[in-house]
């Protein structure tokens, strides 16, 4: 199945995970980059990201190339912000809704604590998808690597290979 990993990463955790997923699935990657970067540190990082996630913002993105006809499945990768997915994914989905029609979807999320299941539910709703082929929630996989995260990543990719 021709797969594209579409992701937004602020601190590198989601980028690292996207690279692992893409390598295991022989998939291409598309990193979304907001036209105006989110703050990287301190209170502003959590305030701006959390506000935009909570209120469904769709920030402008820097130009990217996407040919929906080239892929059967899209795997979305996101940090968890205020129990939701990162707003750049919303922009991508809204800009490409027609090209995403009829595709299969999966998702992974990197989080510092909890909220991934809620983020997956919101992503599924935004996609108007009945289901996701698989989901994966990891807690700080780059900063706090552990055996459990590695096992979950392996299982997620193996399950997607069977679909």
What is the predicted function of each stretch?
Residues 109-114:
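Short beta-alpha junction loops
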Residues 100-104, 129:
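A short helix->loop->beta-strand "cap" motif at the edges of active sites that frequently abuts
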Residues 118-128:
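Short, aromatic/basic amphipathic alpha-helical patches
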Residues 131-163:
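Glycine-rich phosphate/pyrophosphate-binding loop and the adjoining helix
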Residues 25, 126-131:
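Short, structured coil segments at secondary-structure junctions
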Residues 76-77, 107:
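Redox-cofactor binding/interface segments in oxidoreductases and associated redox assembly factors
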Residues 1-76, 83-86, 90-95, 99-101, ...:
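N-terminal beta1-alpha1-beta2 submodule of the flavodoxin-like/Rossmannoid cofactor-binding fold
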């Amino acid at each position: 199945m021709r797969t594209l990993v579409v992701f937004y990463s602020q601190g590198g955790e989601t980028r690292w995970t996207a690279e692992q997923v893409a390598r295991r699935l022989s998939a291409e990657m598309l990193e979304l980059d907001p036209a105006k970067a989110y703050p990287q540190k301190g209170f502003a990082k959590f305030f701006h990201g959390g506000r935009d996630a909570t209120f469904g913002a769709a920030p402008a993105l820097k130009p990217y190339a996407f040919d929906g006809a080239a892929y059967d499945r899209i795997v979305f990768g996101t940090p968890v912000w205020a129990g939701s997915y990162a707003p750049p994914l919303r922009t991508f989905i809204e800009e490409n809704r027609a090209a995403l029609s009829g595709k299969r979807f999966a998702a992974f999320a990197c989080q510092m604590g909890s909220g991934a299941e809620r983020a997956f539910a919101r992503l599924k709703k935004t996609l108007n998808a009945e289901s996701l082929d698989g989901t994966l929630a990891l807690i700080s996989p780059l900063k706090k690597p552990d055996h459990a995260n590695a096992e979950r990543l392996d299982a997620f990719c193996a399950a997607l290979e069977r679909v």
